């Protein structure tokens, strides 16, 4: 509980206080004090109502903060909760193994699937090993390898998107960062097997889009998907980092905006208003959505899978013809 207290967001203070009371009463209940049960139920109800109200009215910038919450579930969590007998694939057969990308095969609801996702890491050591979820070219090449294996063995693909962006270092550029991203997008676009992408946290620019060219693109309600971060946008347009709130609003990067714009196909609700309060519950919601999408896509032929995916992306966007 102390760890979470350090990590809470400003607008979560009231929730944290209620959660601490719930934890204290749970401790007493486990010691045999059954008289606290009614008070415990009342506090749980109060927590749900307060959470629903707080997260329903968040601004775009506040949703970005929730998407970046350090306790938010990562790709590794969704694999743990949803994928059985997961076997990770390592290396890109060219340069090395990028730990910012998890890729491999396992079983989802009894059927084989390929899984690829960004991984930020949880503690300081792992975050450094995972490069804070910012892939190098070898991470994207590893993903491409898994995409092609999935196609060869007729296995559907699931991707989890959660990155501030591809790593912009000199070494990454020298090893072909932009080309690796482009090849990942191209490979996904023409895969002959069904694919579903889920934005679970940050969806930052091309680094995210590399795993986002799927038949179905879903997003958790507090995740975001954008061409640039609010901080980057504020620095470029306003030359002022303090304008992040205005930038977040202007970018229309929230799940609600993206659904209205047709960029994503569905918005997945988060239990208690935010995924970090219930990682397992969030995983179950994601699992139900994945099953629905994969069941729908399984009815398509190989040609239909590719055609529907290409049509989906061709139909995105809007333009106005000047008279």
Swiss-Prot record:
Coiled coil region boundaries: none
Source species, domain of life: Bacteria
Localization (cell): Cytoplasm
GO cellular component: acetyl-CoA carboxylase complex
Primary localization class, coarse: cytoplasm
Keyword Ion transport listed: no
Entry keyword set: ATP-binding, Cytoplasm, Fatty acid biosynthesis, Fatty acid metabolism, Lipid biosynthesis, Lipid metabolism, Nucleotide-binding, Transferase
Domain annotation CoA carboxyltransferase C-terminal: ranges: 35-296
Catalytic activity as recorded in UniProt: N(6)-carboxybiotinyl-L-lysyl-[protein] + acetyl-CoA = N(6)-biotinyl-L-lysyl-[protein] + malonyl-CoA
Pathway this chain belongs to: Lipid metabolism; malonyl-CoA biosynthesis; malonyl-CoA from acetyl-CoA: step 1/1
Family: Belongs to the AccA family.
Function, in words: Component of the acetyl coenzyme A carboxylase (ACC) complex. First, biotin carboxylase catalyzes the carboxylation of biotin on its carrier protein (BCCP) and then the CO(2) group is transferred by the carboxyltransferase to acetyl-CoA to form malonyl-CoA.
Complex and partners: Acetyl-CoA carboxylase is a heterohexamer composed of biotin carboxyl carrier protein (AccB), biotin carboxylase (AccC) and two subunits each of ACCase subunit alpha (AccA) and ACCase subunit beta (AccD).
Name used for this protein in its record: Acetyl-coenzyme A carboxylase carboxyl transferase subunit alpha
Organism: Aquifex aeolicus (strain VF5)
Lineage: Bacteria, Pseudomonadati, Aquificota, Aquificia, Aquificales
Gene name tied to this protein: accA
